[in-house]
């Protein structure tokens, strides 16, 4: 079993912890945060926790901040997982490059490419042939219809419907 260190103990961090716990891959989950009593330490001290049996996950809702932390962790060779809730559906013909969270009830259909640091939130649907560039957040219940190419760090607000090929 492994340990998971989540950077950020806010709402998204709590969600990541909940989903990670449900995957059964971790026997210990802890937080680093600069302003939370739930944290064992501050984010900048993450280097003190690097080990072969520890994964890190930057759980910041700010897309640019999350992607920045991902690059920082990767440069130091930290292990950063993709976390997929057991009730989410990700087509076996979809490619998730790395370090993405797919939350409960989300659907990612066939032929999609999901790049690093994306959040596909509860009940969101990403239909066939879409590409999500790094840091994209598809919020609660949003629908991204087929063959869209969403730009880096785009936020698709809750309940939004993006029509077929609206973003090329």
What do these predicted ranges mean?
Residues 1, 24-25, 49-53:
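Flexible, charged surface loops at secondary-structure boundaries
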């Amino acid at each position: 079993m492994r340990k998971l260190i989540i950077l950020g103990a806010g709402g998204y961090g709590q969600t990541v912890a909940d989903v990670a716990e449900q995957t059964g891959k971790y026997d210990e989950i802890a937080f680093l945060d600069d302003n939370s009593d739930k944290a064992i330490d501050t984010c900048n001290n993450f280097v003190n926790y690097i080990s072969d049996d520890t994964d890190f996950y930057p759980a910041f809702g700010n897309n640019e901040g999350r992607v920045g932390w991902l690059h920082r962790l990767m440069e130091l060779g930290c292990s950063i997982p993709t976390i997929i809730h057991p009730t989410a559906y990700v087509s076996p013909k979809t490619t998730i490059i790395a370090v993405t969270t797919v939350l409960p009830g989300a659907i990612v259909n066939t032929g999609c490419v999901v790049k690093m640091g994306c959040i596909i939130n509860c009940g969101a649907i990403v239909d066939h042939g879409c590409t999500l560039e790094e840091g994209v957040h598809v919020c609660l219940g949003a629908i991204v219809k087929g063959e869209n190419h969403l730009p880096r760090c785009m936020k698709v607000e809750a309940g939004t419907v993006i029509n077929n090929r609206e973003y090329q």
